[in-house]
């Protein structure tokens, strides 16, 4: 069984380098174009369903992809929402550094291990509902990064760009990475690195 994780298209807060987290920020026109492009890329394969985070930027991305592929409207799963960054949400890099310098704890920030746990629970449930099929899952950069660190902890993967695709296999009760930034046989999606948009993710990567 194959799961393809897709990061949503661009939002205004992405372009402003503000931390979004669970704050519901919609797609820009650029983000909708990225979603359509990803849908056309994914059309090279056959798919059974699309599942999404209920946050509007992910759900609209998923809806655009489903329309491109002629699939039913996406279903949603609350466990696929972005990491909660607590009081850092809405801050840009300078504001983050001023209010929470260095290793200062951010009140309300969700632990990465908790994000990975709920995300993997959701992905395993999706996989079990679609044995021997391929499903697209549209979510968020912080969540995808958390899954990658759990599934492939030794690797330091690159940019998780808006609209990018990352493929996984579910087999014998375990999830494994097939390809980071999967080219779907030809090309990868151009976009901006999550860590250039989100100062929390940038700071945590620097500690590794």
Give the role of each language-model region.
Residues 3, 133-139:
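Generic beta-sheet signal
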Residues 4-5, 10-60, 108-120:
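Loop-to-helix element that buttresses phosphate recognition and phosphoryl-transfer chemistry
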Residues 36-99:
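Phosphate-coordination/substrate-recognition cap region in phosphate-metabolizing enzymes
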Residues 44-46, 126-133:
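Glycine-rich phosphate-binding loop signature in dinucleotide/nucleotide-binding domains
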Residues 64, 146, 150:
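Active-site signature of alpha/beta-hydrolase-fold catalytic machinery across serine-
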Residues 71, 83-94, 149-208:
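Acidic, low-complexity terminal tails and accessory targeting/binding regions
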Residues 97-114, 199-208:
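Short glycine/proline- and acidic residue-enriched helix-loop micro-motifs
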Residues 141-145, 171:
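GST superfamily/GST-like fold recognition
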């Amino acid at each position: 069984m194959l799961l393809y994780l897709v990061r949503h298209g661009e939002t205004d807060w992405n372009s402003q380098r503000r931390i979004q987290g669970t704050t519901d920020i919609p797609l820009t026109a650029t983000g909708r174009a990225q979603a359509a492009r990803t849908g056309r890329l994914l059309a090279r394969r056959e798919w059974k369903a699309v599942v999404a985070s209920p946050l509007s930027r992910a759900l609209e991305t998923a809806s655009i992809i489903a329309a491109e592929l002629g699939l039913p409207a996406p279903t949603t799963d609350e466990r696929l929402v972005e990491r909660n960054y607590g009081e850092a949400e809405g801050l840009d890099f300078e504001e983050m550094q001023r209010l929470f310098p260095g290793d200062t704890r951010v009140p309300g920030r969700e632990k990465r291990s908790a994000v990975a746990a709920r995300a993997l629970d959701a992905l395993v449930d999706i996989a079990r509902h679609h044995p021997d099929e391929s499903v697209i899952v549209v979510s968020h950069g912080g969540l995808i990064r958390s899954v990658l660190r759990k599934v492939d902890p030794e690797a330091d993967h690159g940019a998780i760009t808006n609209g990018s695709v990352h493929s996984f296999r579910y087999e014998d009760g375990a999830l494994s990475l097939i390809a980071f930034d999967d080219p779907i046989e030809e090309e990868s999606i151009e976009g901006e690195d999550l860590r250039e948009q989100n100062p929390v993710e940038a700071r945590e990567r620097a500690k590794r």
